[in-house]
Amino acid sequence: MAKDKEKQSDDKLVLTEWQKRNIEFLKKKKQQAEEEKKLKEKLLSDKKAQQQAQNASEAVELKTDEKTDSQEIESETTSKPKKTKKVRQPKEKSATQIAFQKSLPVLLGALLLMAVSIFMITPYSKKKEFSVRGNHQTNLDELIKASKVKASDYWLTLLISPGQYERPILRTIPWVKSVHLSYHFPNHFLFNVIEFEIIAYAQVENGFQPILENGKRVDKVRASELPKSFLILNLKDEKAIQQLVKQLTTLPKKLVKNIKSVSLANSKTTADLLLIEMHDGNVVRVPQSQLTLKLPYYQKLKKNLENDSIVDMEVGIYTTTQEIENQPEVPLTPEQNAADKEGDKPGEHQEQTDNDSETPANQSSPQQTPPSPETVLEQAHG
């Protein structure tokens, strides 16, 4: 029996390599677990210590803040003078820096002058390009020629003083009402032109001569070049033409467009009486001195006019026709003259009316005096 027990103990002591490694692995794992446990305990203790230290520091800071507040209050009450801060003085510049700053404007001016001088020597300083805007009767070549711009002129001269090139255009070309020479980079110049409008045409030999709104005449044009509707002035006196053109510019454009021609009526009583033919077939007689005052009434009267009517504005305003004016006037008899002189006597006036009733039917009555402008306007509105 004793031998059997010794054999069993010997079997227990003999271990394989794998068993030995396993035993070592378990021991190491146990040691690591114990070390991790110790580290956790140490970390917990450290955290507690840090928290306690932080609480203590906050308490100390609160105490120090209270002390500083109390000290500030005490300092305000005692009104102790504050310490002045030291002002930093700028560093002194050297003599060379001061001299450079003083000479810098002179250097820049000299460089600019040198650059301009070099540019003026080059051919680019005289190269110019032109264009025109707003023209209908003039072209670019005429404007350049009238402005007296030379190929040798510097474009800087045009930029600095454009007026000396604009004034000759206004004196030379009658079409131009205003002109402005504007500059565009790098060397382009634009003629901004405003032209006079054509108010009427004067009939001359082999054509028609346009009359501008300033009263000046320009080169004649052919009949094929005329617009569909235009106004013809058949007046010879240039002063009267210029005055009439100025008057027409003040009238409504719709009324002026309806005028076909204007000529002198050759009246013995009114020297400046004008005969105005309208495109609608009517004729207006009006003194030139009263044109702007009376002619606008035609716009209201024409609504009630028959075709080919005559509106006489020489004395007052009344309407008639050519047929009525062509009728011969019957001279008054001596009895009618006597009745006119003794119109205050009722008996004789009644006798004269009886005699008038016996006159032949083919005799026309004397011409009536024209009504006033107010009466005609009331009839037109009615």
Curated annotation (Swiss-Prot):
Supply one GO CC term from the record.
plasma membrane
Q: Does the keyword section mention rRNA-binding? A: no
Localisation: Cell membrane
- Is Lyase included in the keywords of this UniProt record? no
Principal location listed in the UniProt entry: membrane
- What transmembrane ranges does the database entry give? 104-124
Q: What keywords appear on the UniProt entry?
A: Cell cycle, Cell division, Cell membrane, Membrane, Transmembrane, Transmembrane helix
Q: Where is this region: Disordered?
A: 36-92, 322-382
User: What is the membrane topology here?
Assistant: Single-pass type II membrane protein
Q: Which GO terms describe its biological process?
A: FtsZ-dependent cytokinesis
The record, for InterPro entries, names:
Cell_div_FtsQ/DivIB_C, DivIB, FtsQ_DivIB, POTRA, POTRA_FtsQ_type
| Stretches in topological domain Cytoplasmic | 1-103
Which Gene3D superfamilies does the entry link to?
3.40.50.10960
Question: On the Extracellular side, which residues?
Answer: 125-382
Q: Which family does it belong to?
A: Belongs to the FtsQ/DivIB family. DivIB subfamily.
Matching PANTHER family, A to Z?
CELL DIVISION PROTEIN DIVIB (PTHR37820), CELL DIVISION PROTEIN FTSQ (PTHR37820:SF1)
Protein task: Cell division protein that may be involved in stabilizing or promoting the assembly of the division complex.
Q: What is the recorded name of this protein?
A: Cell division protein DivIB
Instruction: Provide the species name.
Output: Streptococcus pyogenes serotype M2 (strain MGAS10270)
